């Protein structure tokens, strides 16, 4: 031994040093494996039983549903993005077909991430201004108590958050004025101008009117139509989940689901499953809060009982 001291503690560390290090590394690996297995089991339970996606004894059934919902149809071969080539299965009549095996894998991944972020109570924003997805974006956001932009993405909505907050405040004041009938006392021209301004702001900002904090998760259904939104997410470091067709850029998304974004049935199917994942996450966080409150109450009653017994003894 190179080091020797009278201290028995140091001597023990000296002797068992290399062995203990090996032991801890093996132990850490075993713990990591266990943790991964637990995570996988939880993920499977969430996706199969709670979210009810891929909940069939015959896995072919899931692919049949995906085919019925037109998830596999891509864009013409000429419009294909180089980054999307690995997600393509084949082509017919000059149009690409998306690989549904990969789509299913990415849907499962997306559902897990959405459940996790919803459990953490993160602000979720849905973005989809294309005609097939606009309606479903609004309904999904309302169902999950999230926020949405489905008419037009105003440039700098995320970059210039301060100016957006000012616009939201302006909309609130205009709505209050209309409710309190203040415009009746104003000249006719000014009253009409204020009404038009209120209607214009509502058209663009109705989905994010009640937002309090900065959006932490963005779900996009039409990347080609909302490219500025995708670029802003990338610039601001906001986690972005996108439904990507064969003509989209996967580099602008943190997580993607390769699927048809032009079909209403395809977008509706995906958003329906996303909504279930968010609802599951929110429900789990509510349960956690309730359990925490129960535990704190129990602790308080125990401590009170101990104090009471001590006082009695005295």
Curated annotation (Swiss-Prot):
The record's GO CC annotations read:
chloroplast; mitochondrial small ribosomal subunit
Which organism does this record belong to?
Stigeoclonium helveticum (Green alga)
Q: Which NCBIfam families match?
A: rpsB_bact
* Principal location: plastid
Q: Example GO biological process term?
A: translation
Q: Which family does it belong to?
A: Belongs to the universal ribosomal protein uS2 family.
What protein am I looking at?
Answer: Small ribosomal subunit protein uS2c
Instruction: Name the Gene Ontology molecular function terms of this record.
Output: structural constituent of ribosome
Write the record's keywords in alphabetical order, separated by commas: Chloroplast, Plastid, Ribonucleoprotein, Ribosomal protein
Question: Where does the source fall among the domains of life?
Answer: Eukaryota
- Which Gene3D superfamilies does the record associate with it? Glucose-6-phosphate isomerase like protein, domain 1, Helix hairpin bin
Record-annotated membrane-spanning stretches: none
Q: Where in the cell is it found?
A: Plastid, Chloroplast
PANTHER family, alphabetically? 30S RIBOSOMAL PROTEIN S2 PROKARYOTIC AND ORGANELLAR (PTHR12534), SMALL RIBOSOMAL SUBUNIT PROTEIN US2M (PTHR12534:SF0)
Q: Which InterPro entries match?
A: Ribosomal_uS2 (IPR001865), Ribosomal_uS2_bac/mit/plastid (IPR005706), Ribosomal_uS2_flav_dom_sf (IPR023591)
Against CDD domains, the record matches this protein to: RPS2
**Which lineage do the record's taxonomy fields give for this organism?**
Eukaryota, Viridiplantae, Chlorophyta, core chlorophytes, Chlorophyceae
